[in-house]
Amino acid sequence: MSWQAYVDEHLMCEIEGHHLASAAILGHDGTVWAQSADFPQFKPEEITGIMKDFDEPGHLAPTGMFVATAKYMVIQGEPGAVIRGKKGAGGITIKKTGQALVVGIYDEPMTPGQCNMVVERLGDYLMKQGL
């Protein structure tokens, strides 16, 4: 299966009548492996900050997490594995695997729990595949 198929079929899938606003699979260096049409472009320093938060959980909490200049308040995630952010009625979930970052961005009416489930399920699957 291509990386684009993972994004199209597993991240942008419909959940209870809703779907993510955008999603992507990125390398740890920020290289885009596959993305949905409306996925924002991360700046290099944003990827650096995200990777540092995986290595040093809590790094982003004081300043927030920036994604394509949009600021997300970092909320409880899983240290070293998942970063979650909130911005208004929407948010973001980033799951780190051995080689990739699985990213989902949502807006209402999708819920944070639905976004977490979609992103983390694919991330867990990729980790089981050694990715």
From Swiss-Prot:
Coiled coil: none
Post-translational modification: Phosphorylated by MAP kinases.
Gene Ontology MF annotations: actin monomer binding
Chain positions found as Phosphothreonine: 111
Miscellaneous field: The variability of the residues taking part of IgE-binding epitopes might be responsible of the difference in cross-reactivity among olive pollen cultivars, and between distantly related pollen species, leading to a variable range of allergy reactions among atopic patients.
Family classification: Belongs to the profilin family.
Disulfide bond entries: 13-115
Quaternary structure (record): Occurs in many kinds of cells as a complex with monomeric actin in a 1:1 ratio.
Stored Pfam families: Profilin
GO cellular component: cell cortex; cytoskeleton
Phylogenetic classification of the source organism: Eukaryota, Viridiplantae, Streptophyta, Embryophyta, Tracheophyta
Renumbered ranges of motif Involved in PIP2 interaction: 81-97
Protein name: Profilin-7
Keywords: Actin-binding, Allergen, Cytoplasm, Cytoskeleton, Disulfide bond, Phosphoprotein
Function: Binds to actin and affects the structure of the cytoskeleton. At high concentrations, profilin prevents the polymerization of actin, whereas it enhances it at low concentrations.
Annotated localization: Cytoplasm, Cytoskeleton
